Amino acid sequence: MQTTEERNVRDGPDGAASNARTHGSAQMRRGRPMERTWFAFGCLLMVAGVAAAAFAAHGLKARLSADNLEIWQTAARYHIYHALALLAVAYAAHRWSNGLTTLAGWLFIAGIVVFSGSLYVLSVSGIKWLGAVTPLGGLCFLAGWASLGAAAWRG
């Protein structure tokens, strides 16, 4: 049988309540799954966006025409902006966890893939019909921002 002093050393002076607080703090540090997911996606896409911008500055400058280089840089710029937007989605998922934050996150990812992706491919391949696909990615960006705003409004 343990003495009171031994239990206090193990559980703290509040016993089980202290354990619950400790467990709760660990849960808060870990965050909710969607918050972590959006933050991780944002960081990974940010790495890719910065790499794409650096590749344009150092690897593509001598290989692409000025017009195609500008197209690539536009793709990288919007890629980075919306990777940052995913960090805002992570915050919104923490603050106002609702379906609109999830929708915003997926729309931003779709926008990066369609808008920036089509421009990346267009700039290096010259496939002109990709220019017709690009605005669909822009619509995803717009819908993502509208969804994020609605999530905040709804609270």
Regions picked out by a protein language model, each given a short descriptive name:
Residues 1-8:
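Extreme N-terminal basic, low-complexity initiation segments
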Residues 16, 25:
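Short polybasic linear motifs
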Residues 20-22:
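Short, low-complexity S/T/E/D/G/P-rich linear segments that nucleate or cap local secondary structure
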Residues 27-155:
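Polytopic transmembrane helical bundles with strong interfacial aromatic enrichment
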